[in-house]
């Protein structure tokens, strides 16, 4: 009888380890959109910037002022409102983002219209519409 709790704990630990090693079953589209959404939800805009299409990042690099503005924002909600494929294999997505300005503590909501393109060479989706514009209502 004394061995049963130890056996149970060992079995649970093995099951948890097996779950942690299970390969991702998400497709590249869902994986990219989910990871980007997590970055925005946690106000990790440097991580979200990594999802922006590289040519767009070169044309419009983030300025120091823009990075400082992102630091003033705390995202409180990120809700998918709609998603539709595009004829070229990309994706259009509309998201409602709730945020608080850390200085004023005022919450507001913006609607972010995202455009994503599939990159067959990199085998991933890139955000072609840029990061959300928090300067508008």
Residue map of PLM features:
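Bacterial N-terminal signal peptides that target proteins for export
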Residues: 1-8
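C-terminal motif of bacterial Sec signal peptides marking the signal peptidase cleavage site
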Residues: 15-18
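Bacterial signal peptide processing site
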Residues: 20-22
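Short, aromatic-enriched amphipathic alpha-helices that serve as compact interaction elements
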Residues: 25-41
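Short solvent-exposed beta->alpha transition segments
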Residues: 30, 45-92, 105
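Sec-exported extracytoplasmic/periplasmic mature domains
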Residues: 37-41, 45, 50-57, 98-101, ...
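Exposed beta-sheet edge and beta->alpha loop/turn motif
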Residues: 84-137
């Amino acid at each position: 009888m004394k061995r049963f709790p130890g056996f149970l704990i060992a079995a649970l630990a093995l099951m948890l380890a097996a779950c942690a090693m299970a390969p991702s079953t998400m497709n590249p589209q869902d994986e990219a959109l989910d990871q980007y959404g997590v970055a925005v939800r946690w106000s990790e805009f440097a991580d979200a910037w990594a999802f922006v299409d590289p040519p767009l990042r070169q044309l419009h690099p983030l300025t120091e002022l823009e990075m400082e503005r992102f630091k003033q924002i705390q995202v409180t909600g990120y809700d998918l409102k709609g998603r539709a494929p595009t004829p070229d294999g990309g994706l259009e997505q509309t998201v409602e983002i709730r945020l608080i300005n850390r200085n004023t503590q005022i919450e507001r909501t913006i609607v972010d219209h995202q455009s994503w393109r599939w990159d067959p060479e990199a085998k991933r989706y890139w955000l072609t519409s840029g990061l959300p514009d928090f300067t508008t209502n």
